[in-house]
Amino acid sequence: MRVALYNLEPEIHNSALMQVSQYHKQKGDDVCMYSPLYHNTYDKIYAFSLFDFTDKGYVTPDMITGGTGFDIKSRLPKEIEDCDLDYSICPDCDYSIIWFSRGCFRNCPFCVVNEKEGYIHSVEPKNLNPNGRYIKVMDNNFFANPNWKSAVEQLHEWNQRIDMQGFDIRLFNEEQAEVISSLKYMYTFKFAWDNPRDNIDDKLDLLVDTIYNRKLMCYVLIGFWSTPEEDLMRVRHLWDDYGIDPYVMPYNKFDEYQRKFARWVNNKVLFKTRTWEEYQDGYINSKEEYEAHLRVKERRSNHNEIPFDF
């Protein structure tokens, strides 16, 4: 059987895609990445998507679809879920994708994790990438895992650098700080501050005092629980008072304010050189506006006028 795998977000390495590949290769099937030019040559096509806003225009009725981008409650069949990951299908993937737990004990109304994966529970980690340079720990809330200490022991045993995707700052304590300091890390240590009504200053104090040798980044949700004033307060408080890099996550990516605010904060050159008020005054919304702005600057410069600087 000739099986094709269609990843609708090719910039993201999809672990489910790798498990489907492993399953079919174990059965002796020929597995490859999907190409529309050879559509009629495939016996079976799997299409994967993580996000509902991803364009599905090239998905055809004969494809087997999966992922939250198609159905929030979609699941892999158990015989595929039990398979290891076939990293060879993604040769540019230079890290291992590891879960020690699934689900979450919280039920935040903006998040699909609890609905999709249920209450937090431990899972056995899959195989490491033989060509991986580091381990990406995908747990939604690492320290909420009832067996997080066993997970730490496994990470020490693997002895590779780690990119941990996130943890709940509200649970953070001195024991966890000691554990984090003992682990090898790569890139940035990440956590979230979703609700501006959560006073997390004592946790931030502990974090910067104990994880001083790591770059810290905080995901800041906007457009759900917060006002624009609270959004600005959080990003300024994180950066000005703690030196923690804020990264804005818009709840509605199509909302003009949320898109504009995220662009300002997440572009660190803009965030560190302009106030929010200054950025709004000089906001450029598109490539066309930017090119028009450059033409105006050039004309003014030619007439010895003071050019507008965005």
Task: Give the location of each predicted region.
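Core AdoMet radical
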Residues: 6, 46-49, 112-207, 214-225, ...
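Acidic/glycine-enriched edge-of-secondary-structure segments
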Residues: 11-31, 107-112, 163-166, 189-196
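Short, well-ordered alpha-helix to beta-strand connector turns
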Residues: 28, 41-43, 60-62, 94-96, ...
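A structural motif corresponding to the C-terminal lobe/cap of the Radical SAM core domain
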Residues: 188-190, 197-310
